[in-house]
């Protein structure tokens, strides 16, 4: 990031660690090419995100960033302004970098919610929803689910009791939804109450510990599993749920929809049906061939 990027082209990117699995560059650069937009989307793999890093991005002409593991909570803290999801849940996955200020957004929840509505809307109505994990993605997803008015009860299962209880408090305080932190043992004993499982931890991700978070015995044909890990296409958790007959929402759908919102924030251009269809096909082909 030492040299200034092309002044006529707009430059965006993704920041996180690790990023070898990321398909975000494929998504954004392909749409820029399809639409004839003079822009590029780069990869910035860094274990640290701080004010110095942000200033380096600004000095290099970076106008916007997708933010992923492990920087979503830090991204919110570094912003001067933030959307309502970021403000309430204290996590952001998108930064717009202006000359004098940084604006944070969270498109995770919107991407996840749209995926559920398209592929398994019934799972929101017939039972309770449990979110596995308490990181930045879990925060955004919990907020959008609570704000949707479609659910009454949310469970959160995480080994980090402190952050889990914080998320439950924020959701219960800012919505009409009761969110409860439960242990993995308690979750197993209440599995008949669950219709939708949303997995948000890195377990199963390419290059990470395989998991699964839950065994095949937990799932049944009346459940839907939404594993937001998209690379590989079938994680050990997805395979376990499939064996039990559960319905699957692929993580690539959330990646697709949250990226479409980021594209709009970055460029000011609303994605159309063709953009979504082409991107879905590219993701499917890439993940199938890996």
Curated annotation (Swiss-Prot):
Taxonomy, superkingdom: Bacteria
Gene for this chain: aroE
Protein role: Involved in the biosynthesis of the chorismate, which leads to the biosynthesis of aromatic amino acids. Catalyzes the reversible NADPH linked reduction of 3-dehydroshikimate (DHSA) to yield shikimate (SA).
Reaction equations catalysed: shikimate + NADP(+) = 3-dehydroshikimate + NADPH + H(+)
Originating organism: Leptospira borgpetersenii serovar Hardjo-bovis (strain JB197)
Record carries keyword Oxidoreductase: yes
Family under the similarity heading: Belongs to the shikimate dehydrogenase family.
Keywords: Amino-acid biosynthesis, Aromatic amino acid biosynthesis, NADP, Oxidoreductase
GO annotation, cellular component aspect: cytosol
Gene Ontology MF terms: NADP binding; shikimate 3-dehydrogenase (NADP+) activity
Alphabetical list of InterPro entries matching this protein: Aminoacid_DH-like_N_sf (IPR046346), NAD(P)-bd_dom_sf (IPR036291), SDH_C (IPR041121), Shikimate_DH (IPR011342), Shikimate_DH-bd_N (IPR013708), Shikimate_DH_fam (IPR022893)
The UniProt record lists the keyword Transcription: no
Name of this protein: Shikimate dehydrogenase (NADP(+))
Residues reported to bind shikimate: 22-24, 68, 93, 108, 230
Active site: 72
